[in-house]
Every structure is written in C-alpha cells, then in structure tokens.
C-alpha cells in the first residue's frame, strides 16, 4: 500500500500501519479501576428506588428465582423500603453527597497522585448506581488502556460483593468488540499492610478515648447462612481478619468479638448478630464498648448510621455506659498505602 494511504497508529502499543481515514487509536496504557458497592444519587424516593432495585435485583445478592423475586421486590419491597432507606441516608448525607462516593473518589485521587502517570491511569466506579462500571471501563479504554485491573474494595471475599463486581465487569466487556486485557484483584483480608493499617487505626482511636473498653466488637456485614453453607469463604475470612488484628494488638483471646450486621429478610444469616449482641453485652458486664467495622474500607450507611447511631442507641438503652465507633480507613494515608500495595501487586508485569 502506498505511504500516502497509511499512517502509523498512536504510540505506545503500535500494531502497524492503518488506513489514513482510520479513527485515531490510542493504546499501551494500563488502567486501574477502584470499585466499591454503590450509593443512590440522592435521598429522595425515586433515587432510592432506582438504587435499591438495581442492588436487590443482583442474583449474587438475592439467590432466589428472579421471576418470583421480582414480583416481591417490585411490589411491596420497593413500595415501602425506599422511604425508610432514604430517611437513613439523610442522616449521613453531606453537602458533597454520599460519604461512600466521596471517600472512594478521594481514594482514587490520592492513588493517582502517588502512582498515576501518562502510562498508568486511575479511576473509580460503583457496582450499583453511579458512576457505573461500564461507563468507567469505556472511559479508560477510550483513554488508551488496553490493560485494565479492577480492584474490588472489599477486604473479605464474598460472592455477594467481589464476585458481583467481576460479573458486572465482564458483562460490560460483552459489548466491546475490541476488549482490553483484564485482571481482577484478590481479597486482602489477611494482607500485612491491611492488618497493620487496621490495627494502627484501632490503637490510635483507643489512645484518644476517655474510657477503657471492656471489649472490642468487630462487626462485619452479614450474608445469608445458606451462602456460607454453599462454600462462600466470607465467614472464614472475617474471623481471620479479627484474629490477625487481635494478635497484632496483643489482645486476650476473648477481647475481640466477631459479629455480623445488616441482615435482610426472614432467613438465617451469619451469627452472632451485631444488634442482638449490642443488646446483650451490658447484662454480661460489658458496659464500655468500642466497635470496629473491618469489612468496610470506607465509611458508609452501615457504619455511620447503623453502627454509630442505631448501634449506640441499642447498646446504651440496654445498660451500656460508653460507646465509640472507630472510623474506617477512608482516604487516610494508611488507606492509600493499602490500595497502593494491592495495585502494585496486581499490576505486576503491566506497570513498573
């Protein structure tokens, strides 16, 4: 073909000459996409309904036949639950929006400032709501990323969370003719950098308290027990995180209590339940309590409202005297250390 009819592809990532009328193709970059659970666009009824419909329609979250479940979900549940959930979100909503969205955005910005470059691009998405995984994958690809590493920001693996992110990631790829190479990151429930960060945040919080806790409650988001029975490793990974943190801080074997929160529906979930434990502890002599939420790298509805507000009310009404919740790592330098460690490990061979 004559030289006048061809031109080179944009470098890096040269794949040879292209016709002169071919669209510009940018390649050779590596993308990192941080993904957390998601958040509604607002606290109003319809924003909440859209978000809950997407979230609760995920077959990874609710493992029942979808035709039957959708009749229940789109009927009574989404008639009443959006208003209730909206009231809860209003308690924690900021001028900048959802705390989870804000912290995830800041994490991406801080990570970009540390390790981002023209070759390594960093962005974030939400598994439910906005910004969506498909939109951010398309953006990274348009920016020249032919290799993308997706980082689910869940310390402990569960099919309800990590696997759902992977499902939605690869579902988005189905619509791409020219797909980027993909990697998904493993859980980090026992990674030393995460255990160090979590232990240090707890230690610092305890030092600043005006009381000495009788026990520390490690509250993780729950999953139905049936999922555990089918082989979900989440329960085991939660207990391992608790054990490693307790060992790091030199706690006695029974000082840390592992519980599970946020159960939904009539079925049995992982136990012991956080709310029932909070109600029972004062009668067992535990009057001063500190609560940690190791399943969440960022503060969200479950930590700011369910634990910090409802949890304190439950504990104090049952006879507790002092109660404090350790903030999540959020966008602290320690949080970025954890995420950077994951990214460097998972992009080995792609990014130097």
Question: Where would I find each of the regions flagged by the language model?
Answer:
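Active-site-proximal alpha-helix that buttresses catalytic centers in soluble enzyme cores
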Residues: 2-352
């Amino acid at each position: 073909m004559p030289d006048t009819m061809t031109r080179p592809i944009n470098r890096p990532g040269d794949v040879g000459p292209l016709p002169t009328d071919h669209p510009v193709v940018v390649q050779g970059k590596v993308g990192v996409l941080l993904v957390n659970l998601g958040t509604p666009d607002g606290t109003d009824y319809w924003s909440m309904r859209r978000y809950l419909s997407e979230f609760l329609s995920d077959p990874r979250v609710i493992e029942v036949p979808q035709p039957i479940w959708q009749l229940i979900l789109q009927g009574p549940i989404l008639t009443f639950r959006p208003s209730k959930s909206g009231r809860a979100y209003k308690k924690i909503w900021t001028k900048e929006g959802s705390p989870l969205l804000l912290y995830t955005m800041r994490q991406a910005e801080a990570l970009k400032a540390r390790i981002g470059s023209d070759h390594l691009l960093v962005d974030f998405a939400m598994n439910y709501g906005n910004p969506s995984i498909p939109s951010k994958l398309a953006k990274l690809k348009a920016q020249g990323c032919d290799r993308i590493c997706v980082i689910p920001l869940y310390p402990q693996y569960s099919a309800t969370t990590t696997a759902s992110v992977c499902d939605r990631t690869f579902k988005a790829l189905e619509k791409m003719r020219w797909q980027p190479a993909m990697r998904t990151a493993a859980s980090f429930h026992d990674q030393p950098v995460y255990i160090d960060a979590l232990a240090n945040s707890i230690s610092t919080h305890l030092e600043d308290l005006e009381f000495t806790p009788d026990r520390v409650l490690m509250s993780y988001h729950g999953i139905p027990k049936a999922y555990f029975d089918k082989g979900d490793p989440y329960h085991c990974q939660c207990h391992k995180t608790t054990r490693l943190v307790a060992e790091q801080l030199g706690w006695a074997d029974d000082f840390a209590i592992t519980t599970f929160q946020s159960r939904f529906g009539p079925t049995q979930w992982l136990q012991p339940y956080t709310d029932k434990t909070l109600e029972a502890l004062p009668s067992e002599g535990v009057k001063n309590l500190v609560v940690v939420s190791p399943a969440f790298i960022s503060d969200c509805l479950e930590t700011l409202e369910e634990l910090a507000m409802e949890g304190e009310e439950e504990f104090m009404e049952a006879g507790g005297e002092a109660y404090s919740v350790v903030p999540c790592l959020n966008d602290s330098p320690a949080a970025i250390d954890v995420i950077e460690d994951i990214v460097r490990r998972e992009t080995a061979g792609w990014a130097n």
